[in-house]
Amino acid sequence: MKTPIYLLLIVCIFASCNTKQTKAEIDYTSYVNPFIGTDFTGNTYPGAQAPFGMVQLSPDNGLPGWDRISGYFYPDSTIAGFSHTHLSGTGAGDLYDISFMPVTLPYKEAEAPLGIYSKFSHDEESAYAGYYQVRLKDYHINVELTATERCGIQRYTFPKAEAAIFLNLKKAMNWDFTNDSHIEVVDSVTIQGYRYSDGWARDQRIYFRTRFSKPFDKVELDTTAIIKDKQHIGTAVIARFDFHTEEGEQILVNTAISGVSMEGAAKNLQAEVPENDFDKYLAETKANWNRQLGKIEVESNNQDDKVNFYTALYLSLIHISEPTRL
């Protein structure tokens, strides 16, 4: 008995669909371990970034040193902020721009350069391509990070508390030095400003626009003069935004950056993160990473080989930063 050709075509179509579905279901991000290279002098960071992204949103341990070039050193046990720009594997410490730190009151503060900080444990920390999470032990705050090309999205889960979110444009580590900074309140959920700095790269200028998912109750600005070679060259600004939070309440901090202007940062925020929806942007960034990582498929029964390969591929794709056009 001859099989009709149309039946063979149907079988082939279903087989083809099944093959594509199986390949699409592979989660390549699960093979990426962003903590590889964060020990000794690997100088990598574990935070969140989109492929080729301008934003590298990652935790900072708050201390300078050769092992902490990227802002993060695995043997450390403190976190002193989450900033939006980092260098990976360079051997030269710079950037650390636009650093936020959530706390509950009263908060812990040490002498500079550490400043406001919290203890943390690697048992309460996780990361994969496009996502980072840690629990701040001293404040019982869970922090989650993701990013689009030009925006960083933070989700803080608070206990019932009087809480605050600090934005520190004064903080600098290693080669980095703050030349000038500015913060202005646009409305009860929106701020904008800039940070100018010098370091390994000279005359860096980062502009930002931030939108909170909840109105802040109060804002305080602490400004100090920046003196260099006995000359007043600018102002260092630290802002504190106060909130009352209920148990399990989440506040999103959405920040866009630009190398051109505050208006450009505002346009980037509206274009890439118009909604207060962490899970939506995380899913989009994860899908983006799977598209990039999935361009090379490794056939191996050795899980470690896959982790090593896809982590190396991931690290190669975070070096090609998307240039700002706004």
What are these regions (language model features)?
Residues 15-16:
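C-terminal motif of bacterial Sec signal peptides marking the signal peptidase cleavage site
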Residues 2-9:
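Sec-dependent signal peptide recognition
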Residues 22-321, 325:
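Accessory carbohydrate-recognition regions in carbohydrate-active enzymes
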